[in-house]
């Protein structure tokens, strides 16, 4: 299966296995174990989004415009852009690259995240376009979305995987 990760989540689980997908927008993330604290990211940021204090180098995501200057100049590859703005057509084109594999294996595409239903209109359009291409569809969801959305999603899905977060 091909997995398309959509950013944005309506829960903040302490044990989240995809914390980079919590915020809905693309963001610059730092892998602290690779950071040498050279300060180049802070020097090159034209918006003052990167700064340091006793805790180390931090990013103010409200100031960051994701220009990539800090990523390009990081000598230790500690910075990366997580998430990309894509159109429905771009996503479906990527998914269709694996069409031969799907036909041989019975696979398809799974939309995951974060919580894919956070981007419900985009998700619905992607599912519809994949179905038009004859691609089997699935979502991995926490199930925490409006009931009305279920009626719109159901006809476009072959599988629904519900990730149960907690039971009492």
Where in the sequence are the language-model features?
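N-terminal pre-core extensions flanking Radical SAM catalytic domains
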Residues: 2-4
């Amino acid at each position: 299966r091909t997995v398309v990760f959509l950013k944005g989540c309506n829960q903040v689980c302490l044990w989240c296995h995809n914390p980079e997908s919590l915020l809905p927008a693309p963001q610059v993330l730092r892998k602290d174990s690779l950071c040498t604290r050279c300060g180049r990211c802070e020097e090159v940021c034209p918006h003052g989004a990167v700064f340091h204090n006793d805790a180390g180098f931090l990013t103010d995501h409200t100031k960051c415009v994701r220009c990539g200057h800090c990523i390009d100049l990081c000598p230790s590859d500690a910075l990366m852009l997580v998430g990309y703005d894509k159109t429905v057509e771009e996503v479906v084109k990527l998914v269709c690259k694996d069409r031969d594999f799907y036909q041989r294996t019975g696979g398809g595409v799974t939309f995951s995240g974060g919580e894919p239903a956070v981007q419900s209109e985009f998700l619905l359009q992607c599912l519809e376009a994949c179905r038009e291409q004859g691609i089997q569809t699935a979502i991995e969801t926490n199930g925490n979305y409006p009931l009305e959305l279920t009626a719109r999603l159901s006809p476009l899905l072959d599988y629904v995987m519900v990730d149960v977060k907690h039971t009492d």
